[in-house]
C-alpha cells in the first residue's frame, strides 16, 4: 500500500473521525477505554460553561431524562447476578399503605448538579427506592396499628387519649368484654364511649338485655340518653327494665317539646292513664286541669273590655304559667267573682287545694298592688262567736307589713298592721324601719325609757306633731321613768 499523503494525515489527525485500521490498539476495547478517560476528564474538569453542555449517555440520550432512567433501571435488574435483587412486578402498586414515594419523585431532576453521577449512584438512587421489596415494620411497632389490640389494651389507650379503634370487636362476646373492661377502670368517659359504639352496632333489644345485669353501665347509659334528649329510646329502655313509673315520667316530660297549647293539653290528657305513682298521678291531673282552665281564661280575657283591663293592660299570656302565678292573675283581674266561674280565685283555691297561708300571701300582693286597702283588710277580718271583728293572719304580721310597704302602702295602713305585732322588740324594730312615729313614741312610753325618747326627738323636725307629742310626754310628771 502506498503511504498517505501529508494532507491526508493532517485530515485524519484533526477530524473526530478516524480511519479504519487493523492495528490491535485501535480495537473496540481501546476505544472504550479512551471514551472512559474522556468522560473522567470531563468529571474532573469543572468548566464554567457546564450549563451550556448537554450531558448524554453512551446511547446518545440526555442523562437524567425519563427514558434514560427507565432503561438504566431495567438494565440493572437484568444484571441480577451482580445485584441479586428479587424479581418483582415493575408496575406501580397504588394500593400499598405507608409508602412515602410516588412516581413523580422517581424522575424528579436535581437542580444544577455539579458533576455527573456514576452508574452505581444512579442505580442505587432509582432502583432501591422503587424496586426494593417493602419491609414489614418490627413487631414492637405493631401497637401503633390499633386493629390488633385486645380489649384491655384498647381501654388503656382510650384512657391515655391515644388512637384506638373499636371496629375490630364485632362479635357480641368481644363487645361485652370491651364493656366490662371499661367498667372495671371506673372511667365514665370511657364507659360512655363504649356504650355509644354498642348503641350503634347492636340492636336495642340485645343492648337492653345485656345492660340489665350491668348496673354501672346501665346508669351511664340512662344518663347519656337524658343528656342527649333521646326521650323515646329512654322510655323504651325503662319499659324493658320494668321501671314503669320512671317510664311514665319520661313520657310525661315529652309535653315540654309541644308548643301548641291545644296539642299539649291533649297529650297531658293521654298521660293520665300512665302508671304513675299516686303523688305523680295527682300532679299530672292538676297540670292537665290547670292548662285546660288557662286556655278558657285566656280566650275570655283576650276579648275583655272592662275597666281593670284598660287601666292595667295584660303584659303576658297566662298560658303555661304556674298555679301560683295563675292565682295571682285571678286575684288581680277577677277578684270577687262567684266561685262557680273558672277564673274565680276561690274556685282556683278549692280546685287545686291551695293552703290558706299561700292564698292569703298571693291575694295580699295582688290587692296591695292595686291599692285596694279595703280588700286587704277583708283578707284578715274574722268574726268571733260573739260577732266581734278581729284581725287574724296565717302569716306573721311583720311579713304583712313588708308586703304592704313594698306596694307603697300609706303610713296609716302600715301602722295599723305594725300594732298587730305581738313581740314588743320586733314591733319597735319594724316601726323604726318604716318610720312609724306614733308606734315608736308609744312603745318608748310604755317602756318608760326617757333617754330613748330624747334621742328620737332629735331626729324629728321641730314643731312637727310627733316632736310636740314627745315634748308633752317628757314634761308629764305622772310618768315614772326608768332613766
UniProtKB/Swiss-Prot annotation:
GO cellular component: a single term: recycling endosome
This protein's UniProt keywords: Cytoplasm, Cytoplasmic vesicle, Differentiation, Endosome, Protein transport, Spermatogenesis, Transcription, Transcription regulation, Transport
Pfam families (alphabetical): Vps16_C (PF04840)
The organism's place on the tree of life at top rank: Eukaryota
Gene Ontology BP annotations: cell differentiation; hepaticobiliary system development; intracellular protein transport; spermatogenesis; vacuolar transport
Tissue distribution of the protein: High levels detected in liver and small intestine of larvae at 5 days post-fertilization.
Compartments, record wording: Cytoplasm; Cytoplasmic vesicle; Early endosome; Recycling endosome
UniProt function note: Proposed to be involved in endosomal maturation implicating in part vps33b. In epithelial cells, the vps33b:vipas39 complex may play a role in the apical rab11a-dependent recycling pathway and in the maintenance of the apical-basolateral polarity. May play a role in lysosomal trafficking, probably via association with the core HOPS complex in a discrete population of endosomes; the functions seems to be independent of vps33b. May play a role in vesicular trafficking during spermatogenesis. May be involved in direct or indirect transcriptional regulation of E-cadherin.
Subunit structure and binding partners: Interacts with vps33b.
Name assigned to this protein: Spermatogenesis-defective protein 39 homolog
Organism: Danio rerio (Zebrafish)
Amino acid at each position: 500500500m502506498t503511504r498517505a499523503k501529508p494532507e491526508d494525515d493532517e485530515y485524519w489527525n484533526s477530524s473526530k473521525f478516524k480511519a479504519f485500521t487493523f492495528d490491535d490498539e485501535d480495537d473496540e476495547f481501546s476505544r472504550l477505554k479512551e471514551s472512559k478517560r474522556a468522560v473522567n476528564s470531563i468529571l474532573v474538569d469543572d468548566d464554567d460553561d457546564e450549563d451550556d453542555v448537554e450531558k448524554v449517555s453512551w446511547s446518545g440520550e440526555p442523562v437524567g431524562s425519563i427514558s434514560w432512567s427507565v432503561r438504566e433501571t431495567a438494565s440493572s435488574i437484568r444484571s441480577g447476578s451482580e445485584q441479586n435483587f428479587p424479581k418483582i412486578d415493575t408496575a406501580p402498586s397504588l394500593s400499598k399503605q405507608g409508602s412515602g414515594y410516588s412516581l413523580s419523585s422517581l424522575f424528579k431532576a436535581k437542580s444544577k448538579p455539579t458533576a455527573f453521577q456514576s452508574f452505581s449512584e444512579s442505580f442505587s438512587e432509582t432502583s432501591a427506592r422503587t424496586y426494593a421489596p417493602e419491609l414489614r415494620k418490627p413487631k414492637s411497632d405493631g401497637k401503633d396499628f390499633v386493629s390488633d389490640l385486645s380489649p384491655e389494651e384498647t381501654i388503656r389507650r382510650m384512657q391515655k387519649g391515644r388512637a384506638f379503634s373499636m371496629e375490630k370487636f364485632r362479635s357480641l362476646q368481644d363487645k361485652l368484654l370491651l364493656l366490662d373492661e371499661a367498667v372495671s377502670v371506673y372511667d365514665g368517659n370511657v364507659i360512655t364511649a363504649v356504650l355509644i359504639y354498642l348503641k350503634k352496632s347492636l340492636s336495642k333489644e340485645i343492648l337492653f338485655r345485656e345492660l340489665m345485669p350491668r348496673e354501672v353501665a346501665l346508669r351511664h347509659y340512662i344518663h347519656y340518653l337524658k343528656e342527649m334528649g333521646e326521650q323515646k329510646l329512654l322510655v323504651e329502655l325503662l319499659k324493658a327494665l320494668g321501671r314503669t313509673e320512671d317510664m311514665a315520667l319520661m313520657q310525661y316530660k315529652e309535653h315540654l317539646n309541644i308548643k301548641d297549647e291545644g296539642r299539649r293539653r291533649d297529650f297531658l290528657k293521654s298521660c293520665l292513664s300512665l302508671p304513675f305513682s299516686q303523688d305523680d298521678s295527682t300532679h299530672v291531673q292538676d297540670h292537665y286541669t290547670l292548662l285546660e282552665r288557662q286556655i278558657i281564661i285566656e280566650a275570655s280575657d283576650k276579648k275583655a273590655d272592662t275597666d281593670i283591663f284598660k287601666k292595667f293592660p295584660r303584659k303576658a299570656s297566662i298560658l303555661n304559667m304556674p298555679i301560683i302565678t295563675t292565682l295571682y292573675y285571678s286575684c288581680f283581674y277577677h277578684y270577687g267573682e262567684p266561685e262557680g266561674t273558672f277564673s274565680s280565685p276561690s274556685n282556683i283555691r278549692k280546685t287545686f287545694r291551695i293552703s290558706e297561708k299561700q292564698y292569703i300571701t298571693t291575694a295580699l300582693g295582688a290587692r296591695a298592688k292595686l291599692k285596694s286597702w279595703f280588700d286587704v283588710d277583708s283578707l284578715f277580718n274574722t268574726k268571733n262567736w260573739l260577732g266581734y271583728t278581729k284581725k287574724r293572719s296565717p302569716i306573721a304580721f311583720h311579713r304583712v307589713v313588708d308586703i304592704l310597704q313594698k306596694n307603697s302602702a300609706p303610713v296609716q295602713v302600715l301602722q295599723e298592721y305594725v300594732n298587730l305585732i305581738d313581740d314588743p322588740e320586733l314591733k319597735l324594730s319594724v316601726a323604726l324601719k318604716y318610720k312609724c312615729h306614733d308606734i315608736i313614741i308609744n312603745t318608748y312610753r310604755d317602756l318608760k325609757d326617757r333617754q330613748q325618747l330624747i334621742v328620737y326627738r332629735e331626729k324629728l323636725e321641730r314643731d312637727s306633731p310627733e316632736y310636740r307629742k314627745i315634748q308633752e310626754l317628757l314634761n308629764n310628771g305622772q310618768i315614772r321613768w326608768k332613766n
